[in-house]
Structures are given as structure tokens and as C-alpha cells.
């Protein structure tokens, strides 16, 4: 049986901890919170959790429910600025720290999310919606 990174880091409980910690920070963040149109962050949290589960080799529930991730397209209506990407990384770092991965696992995860955060920047303006 092939072991995936998802399995190596502890599967769903680990992703759940990372994402819950991340969204606890987002909920209080004055830069990021306005980017989420829903009153309740729960649906966004669930989508992100399912995306990360699938990305790292777990069940493909995300694609089964939502199709191809198309991350830039899904985020296009929102002004993702360099400042927003930085704040996003601050909260994701808190999530990774809470998960207490091995240094190698942490580096692999962090490398992906830092690249993803930079990739999602779509404007230099400080507007929350485009």
C-alpha cells in the first residue's frame, strides 16, 4: 500500500487541527475576514479542509462535491493583496505549529502554502471585492 503525505501527517485529524486553528485566526483578522462573504465561516472552513485532505492524498471528496479546485478562478472575485497573503500565512503558520508535524513534514507543507499564497495574489489594491 502506498503511503501518502496525508497518511504520514496523521490524516484527517491533523488537517482538521490545522484548518480549525487557521480559521480561528481568520475570524478575528481585520484584513482577511472581509474577504469571506458568508456570515458563518463554517462552509469556507469545510471547503478548505476537504481541499487540503484531497491535495495531500486523502479522499477526493472535494472534487466529487465541487469539481476541479480552480483556485485562482474561485478567488478572482476577491482582492487578494500581498498584505492579505501575508496575513493568510500568519494564520496558516499558527495551524501548522498547532499540528506539531515533524520538521520535514512542516517544511513540505509550508513550502506548498507559501507558494500557494503568493500565487493567489491578484491585485495590489486594498479593496476587499473586485
Question: Which residue ranges define each predicted feature?
Answer:
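Heme-based O2/NO sensor domains and their adjacent alpha-helical segments
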Residues: 1-3, 16-97, 103, 109-112, ...
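Short, low-complexity N-terminal intrinsically disordered segments enriched in polar/charged residues
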Residues: 1, 5-11
